[in-house]
């Protein structure tokens, strides 16, 4: 992964080197250790704040070169706004602000993890460190020539805390979680000639090093299972399909697992119903759901989560050739239900149909959550700030909404109902794979619901959040890694053994 920042924790008494970072509120007040570290430079800070009209607003930063009275070569004062308003996600964002101030080349950074009232808690300092790593991620593997102002970053960030041991303990699961997010980002950012189904499966299989059980289904295995919906999508590509089943057994032996299913269309041309050429290159990211599931499984295994989990991803390419699926074809899914193909560019739901059915019937999970860059319609409805949430279970939907608000990876519940079924009724088969333009994200979810049977289930349409979403305080990457933090928190809060 393109991780260019190392983060560690040191005692508050550590002398600052290179760049010194402190925090202040809207009154420009800092904590006692911060004031001690600043020494006589406090006056220089006040003058600079007045000159630049720095007010200590949340996320605002005052950058001072060679501050008088300090051995540090740079001083950055970051505003926190009103301390009483700070929530967990705000510390991630503050960490992102730190990362945004890092220069190119080697740089030593000391951060005083302190609020005006005193030291940050271990959890707050851990979130700060995670925010630094999330923002600092960069994907530039294929650039052979870099501009002078785009030199490689090699920063060492030392976060000064009151209790080093407790903060390290709090950061350990956060560190694995950031690794999981960055794995998901890396997968989404890779070009499609590099990351095709077999290569994706190979990378997912590397989770075995963390104790994750791996099963890879090739085309003969899926043919034997009668996964006709998934294989129909894949038949136009020279790159054979794969389905990868990942299992983490961290809970009680024999306890039913929870399950996460990801759409993994490694490149989507639309097939015979071919897409316009403009922005087709973005369809390398049509496997954002599968990338999230792999990143999530890494995060859970890295912290040895006390829960049994299944992660399943269907990996295909949707390509046009003489053997490609045609509009008008009828395929038989693993469930035995038949599907008339109206539009070959409505392929993700076909992939998910077979993988959802496989997981529901073979592993009998307590619930399933699927993630998919499924419809452009969800972007019309929600833009790029929220993922669409569809569910047949109110408790699961409520929990997803709550952890979305806590992590900043927000969801918005959309309707399901039998009234929408008529849009996907077929004259020739049990159903067709797309309806009218109206309510397109809803009818896609309504289609998926036919393949979960009675299993509690939620569908996250992440077309607007997984890739090319707006850059934020903690993400500057085209592939955002959306969903890893959301689902990790869902598991930790509601489903792990305490």
Swiss-Prot record:
PROSITE patterns for the chain: CYTOSOL_AP
GO process annotations (BP): proteolysis
Active-site residues, record numbering mapped to chain: 275, 349
Textual note on the cofactor: Binds 2 manganese ions per subunit.
GO molecular function list: manganese ion binding; metalloaminopeptidase activity
Enzyme Commission designation: 3.4.11.1, 3.4.11.10
SUPFAM superfamilies listed in its UniProt record: Macro domain-like, Zn-dependent exopeptidases
Role this protein plays: Presumably involved in the processing and regular turnover of intracellular proteins. Catalyzes the removal of unsubstituted N-terminal amino acids from various peptides.
Name used for this protein in its record: Probable cytosol aminopeptidase
